[in-house]
């Protein structure tokens, strides 16, 4: 008979591949006489809409799955330890952690235990016990199981603060190939239901005092990138459509980490495309807060993001006709197109110039990143800097693409090592035997020359 601690260890570990909230990845057990523990028992962090960081218990209800998705560590044919909570076990575990001040909420997902309806019924019962018997008022993020009855989606939406339905892969073709048990329509249907009921609930909350909220923190989704051949342009078009049609709060991107051997997937030794994931998040930010469109960021000729430039700088290099921008007269929308100017600094510029004309000194105090912005703006009609093309290119290159750390081989022996999110070209040269720092310098020089020619 498996005890609760064993179940927690298995089901917290099985939940770590879901990126809708983040974990540290540390697995240092507690010690007698010491305060605290960083054991990998499912404690992770998420950020609320107002910027607060909350600690969540991140677990699966069960990792016993009736589906056989090729990319999933919990797939039916994979030989691994299996466990399932009972609704009361999960509720008592959550409330126990909450009372000890370990967590502020719960992130709950599950493998498909038998059928989607059966899985959702068990998850709902666990949340009902938490809310109604223990009067738990903390944050709950629940994953909706595609294919479940709409009535069950409504029930879980009344108990959870946020819902999410994972879109899994960027195209229906990839979904059919790697996850034949899942259907695109079964994923999109609950997304549409959640969007409609969430909007309706907000109206009811205004009109009726006793109205019950439905997923008041909205919904999100997650997709795996790097396991299938879709371009970044395809992914951003999909993302833009999801935000527009389903009013999503977030789309999360998960760089594919090979965990199972399958001829349809990248080999087990393949490094996850972390830099590509980073570029997608940067582009996602541009869609949500900078008012870019997906088709502005990528073209048919260049359907993937530049590994050496962030998407905003890439757009600026492609559109010299837009610059320079006069900071004392430009609209907020125009300011947001300038590399080095973000939403907060753009708003501060608009407010500050009502009082006085702005120069470089004022922009620096406002928070503008002048290292990049100085090449794209004028202040009172004067260009801030007239750098050479090579100087401008050097200022725009993303240092993250050439990131190198130090790896300790022995007490006195340290060697440079390319970090996991360095550009693929750096990692390839290192794999061929070149020192990581030399590889980074070589790739940076080549990228600099290439960018200088484009400008």
Protein language model regions, located:
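Conserved Radical SAM active-site core
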Residues: 1-67, 71-221, 226-229, 242, ...
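Short Lys/Arg-enriched helix C-cap and helix-to-coil transition segments
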Residues: 361-365, 374
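Residue-level signature of tetratricopeptide-repeat
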Residues: 352-353
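Long, highly charged, low-complexity intrinsically disordered interaction regions
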Residues: 264-336, 372-421, 454-455
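Flexible, acidic/Gly-rich N-terminal and inter-domain linker regions that tether
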Residues: 1-64, 369, 377, 385-455
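A structural motif corresponding to the C-terminal lobe/cap of the Radical SAM core domain
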Residues: 176, 188-195, 226-311
């Amino acid at each position: 008979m498996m005890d609760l601690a064993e179940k927690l260890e298995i089901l917290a570990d099985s939940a770590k591949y879901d990126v809708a909230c983040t974990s540290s990845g540390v697995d240092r057990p507690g010690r007698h006489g010491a305060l605290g523990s960083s054991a990998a028992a499912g404690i992770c962090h998420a950020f609320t809409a107002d910027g607060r960081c909350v600690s969540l218990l991140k677990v699966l209800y069960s990792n016993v799955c009736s589906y056989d998705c090729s990319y999933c560590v919990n797939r039916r044919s994979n030989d691994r330890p299996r466990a399932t909570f009972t609704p009361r076990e999960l509720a008592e575990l959550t409330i126990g952690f909450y009372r000890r001040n370990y967590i502020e909420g719960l992130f709950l997902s599950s493998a498909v235990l038998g059928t989607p309806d059966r899985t959702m019924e068990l998850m709902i019962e666990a949340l009902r016990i938490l809310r109604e018997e223990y009067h738990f008022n903390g944050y709950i993020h629940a994953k909706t199981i595609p294919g479940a009855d709409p009535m069950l989606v409504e029930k879980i939406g009344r108990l959870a603060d946020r819902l999410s339905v994972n879109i899994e892969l960027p195209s229906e073709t990839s979904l059919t190939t790697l996850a034949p048990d899942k259907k695109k329509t079964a994923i999109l249907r609950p997304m549409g239901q959640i969007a409609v009921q969430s909007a309706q609930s907000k109206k009811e909350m205004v009109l009726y005092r006793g109205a019950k909220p439905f997923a008041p923190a909205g919904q999100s989704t997650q997709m795996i990138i790097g396991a299938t051949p879709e371009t970044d342009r395809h992914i951003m078009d999909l993302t833009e459509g999801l935000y527009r049609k389903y009013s999503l709060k977030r789309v999360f991107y998960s760089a594919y980490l090979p965990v199972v051997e399958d001829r349809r997937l990248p080999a087990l030794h393949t490094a996850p495309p972390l830099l590509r994931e980073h570029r997608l998040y940067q582009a996602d930010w541009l869609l949500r807060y900078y008012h870019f469109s997906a088709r502005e960021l990528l073209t048919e000729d260049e359907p993937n993001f530049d590994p050496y430039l962030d998407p905003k700088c890439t757009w600026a290099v492609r559109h010299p006709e837009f610059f320079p921008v006069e900071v004392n007269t430009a609209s907020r929308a125009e300011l947001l197109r300038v590399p080095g100017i973000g939403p907060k600094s753009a708003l501060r510029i608009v407010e500050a110039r009502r009082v006085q004309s702005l120069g470089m000194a004022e922009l620096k105090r406002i928070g503008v990143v002048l290292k990049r912005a100085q090449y794209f703006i004028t202040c009172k009609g004067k260009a801030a800097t007239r750098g050479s093309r090579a100087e401008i290119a050097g200022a725009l290159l993303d240092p993250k693409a050439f990131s190198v750390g130090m790896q300790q081989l022995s007490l006195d022996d340290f060697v440079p090592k390319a970090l996991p999110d360095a550009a693929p070209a750096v990692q390839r040269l290192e794999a061929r035997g070149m020192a990581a720092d030399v590889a980074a310098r070589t790739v940076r020089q080549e990228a600099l020359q290439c960018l200088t020619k484009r400008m």
